[in-house]
Amino acid sequence: MPSHVEKAPEMSENNAWRSVHGLLGADTAARVAFLGVPLGRESITRGRCDLAPATLRAALKRMSVYDLETGTDLSNLAVFDAGEVGVAALTPAEAFAPIRDAARTQTQTRALTILAGGNNAITRPGVHALGLRKAGLITLDAHFDLRDTDGGLNNGNPIQALLEDGLEGAAVSQIGLAPFANTRKAHGKARRAGITVHTLADCATNGFVVLVESELERLSGFCEAIYVDFDIDVIDRAQMPAAPGARPGGIAVRDFLAAARVAGAHPKVKCVDLAEFDPGRDVGEIGALTAARWFAEVLAGFAARQ
């Protein structure tokens, strides 16, 4: 008889590929949830943000669960697939309650809920899902999103609407605000409300990821839960053609992805969203693959919590 136990042959690399898409499933005990929010109506720049959740899902099949840079392996991380909220045909006002309720269902039972928009109007109901009295909000965005609401809700006024709803300005931090992309009026509103403002110049001086880390710590000092809005128009337009509002001189995509991992790792971050990805404007799948990588980075950050 042989004196040793023979090892089972390793699975061929041709059959061993496991994608991030394969992490999505029906495990009700999963600590992370994924919810698609295909809201596209009332976008200031018309487009097809409603296509983004499905495009992101498809692109996840091209993301491996293994990060060779850090040795992180997501193979054992289950993500509950909460499907999509049926809001593609609705206005932001009509979609508010369905999005809030669907997000709340997940945030009440999960450590982290990932919302895939959709335009930036998804952020208001997402924050409401956590509760205005206990939530802090970080927006990674080229714009204040403080347009007046007298003409109705759109993707240019979710922060204004939240302030009117009762969210304290001191609980809001906005990082990545771009020059010549905002108004004096909006800047004044932010100052009067007590919002913490970090421009692109501040990001260049202090470091985008460093500012995200510092604002997470600041808000965690007095907020029970933190919501992080990732508007992809904060990325430099040369690296993100699929964002209608992106401008030259924005954040490097590498820093955007690093911030996703930082947010995913913070224990008080209970909900994140990805907004303003428009597949109809994508070039060479740059936006789709960036969105998928963002999702993987959020999960990698979350894995570090455990």
Task: Identify the residue ranges that each predicted region occupies.
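Conserved alpha-helical scaffold segments that buttress catalytic/binding sites
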Residues: 2-306
